[in-house]
Amino acid sequence: MRAPDFWYTPPQAPALLARLLQPFGKIYGMATARRLAKGTPVKLDVPVICVGNLNAGGTGKTPTVIAVLTTLMDMLETPHVVTRGYGGSLKGPVRVDPSKHTAKQVGDEPLLLAAFAEVWVARDRAAGCAAAAQGGASVVVLDDGFQNPSVHKDFSLIVVDAEKGFGNGRCLPAGPLREPVDIGLKRADALLSVGAAEAQARFDSSTLPTDLPHIRGALTPLQTGMDWSDMRAIAFAGIAHPEKFFATLRALGANVVHSEPLDDHQPLSTALMSRLEADAKRQNAQLVTTEKDAARLPNSFRTKVITLPVRLSFDGQENALADLLRPVVKS
C-alpha cells in the first residue's frame, strides 16, 4: 500500500477525506498513548538506540540505520540490529542468515541490513533485544519500535522526510502519523530530517521544539562506477515513495523509458518479473531497482537487474551523528 495523497495536504487546509477521518485519527492517537503507558519497559545491560519515526511509511529510516551502524562500528562497538521483519513469516527471535533466509521468511530490510551487521528478527522486541545482547552485541539498534513500550530506549532518533514533513498533522487513517507530533517529539532525543537543501529549508520553517537536537542529511547515490548517463532503464520500486527513486535515476542521467511503482514491500512474483523482463527486451532497456527491492527478487532474476544503492550523507554535519551517539555508548 502506498500513502494516499491527502495525507500530505497542508495541515491548515486538510483534504475533505482527512476531515472525515479525523475522529478515527483521534482514536488511533489515544490508542497509541494507552499502549505506551502500559507496563514497565525492559532495561538491558547494553545501550539501546532506537531509530524510529512518527510517520507511517518511508522516511529514510533504513539508510539511517545503516549510517548509525557504520558510525557505531567506527567507535569500535559491536552493534546488532533488532527489527520486526515486516513482510516475513518468522516470529523469532532469529538471527538473520542471508545464506539461508529469504525475504519471505525475514523481510527485505533485514536481509539488506545483514550486509552491515548482525540482525535479529523478532515480533517480540524485548525478546529480540535480549537475544542480541546475549549474542554479543555491545549496543542494540532498534529498527523502528519508537511506539513499542516493551524496551527501554537509551536514545531515540526520529527520522522524517524533509519534503513530506509530518504531512497534514493528523493520525492514521486521517493522516500519516502514528501519534501526534508534539507528544512524540517530547520522548525523542534527536530529530533527523532527510532531504535536499530546498526541502530542508521548507521543513525548517515549520514549528519544531527549539530544545530538540536537529541534524540534517540527504540520500545520495553510492558511487559504484556505474555510468548511468543515457542508460535506457525500466525502473521498478516497491518502497513508500517510489517516485523519489525514479527521480534519482533521471538526475543521474538515465533515460527511464518506463517506471513501475509498486506497493511497499510488494512481493516480486515470477510473473511480474517476467513481464518487466519482456518489456526491457522489447525496449532494449535495463531493469533497475532499489537495494531493498533487490532482496525480494526471485533467484532467477538476480543477475538480470541492476540496483542503485543510496546512502545517508551529512553535508557540513559529518560528525553530528557521532557526537549524538558517543555519550550513549561511552557512558
Swiss-Prot record:
One GO cellular component term: plasma membrane
Single Gene Ontology BP annotation: lipopolysaccharide core region biosynthetic process
Sequence positions that bind ATP: 55-62
InterPro entries associated with the record: LpxK (IPR003758)
Statement: the UniProt record of this protein carries the keyword tRNA processing: no
Molecular function GO terms recorded: ATP binding; tetraacyldisaccharide 4'-kinase activity
Keywords: ATP-binding, Kinase, Lipid A biosynthesis, Lipid biosynthesis, Lipid metabolism, Nucleotide-binding, Transferase
Group of enzyme by EC: transferase
Enzymatic reactions: a lipid A disaccharide + ATP = a lipid IVA + ADP + H(+)
One family name in Pfam for this protein: LpxK
Keyword Kinase: yes
Pathway involvement of the protein, from the record: Glycolipid biosynthesis; lipid IV(A) biosynthesis; lipid IV(A) from (3R)-3-hydroxytetradecanoyl-[acyl-carrier-protein] and UDP-N-acetyl-alpha-D-glucosamine: step 6/6
Record EC number: 2.7.1.130
Family: Belongs to the LpxK family.
Known function: Transfers the gamma-phosphate of ATP to the 4'-position of a tetraacyldisaccharide 1-phosphate intermediate (termed DS-1-P) to form tetraacyldisaccharide 1,4'-bis-phosphate (lipid IVA).
Name this protein carries in UniProt: Tetraacyldisaccharide 4'-kinase
Source species of the chain: Roseobacter denitrificans (strain ATCC 33942 / OCh 114) (Erythrobacter sp. (strain OCh 114))
Name of the encoding gene: lpxK
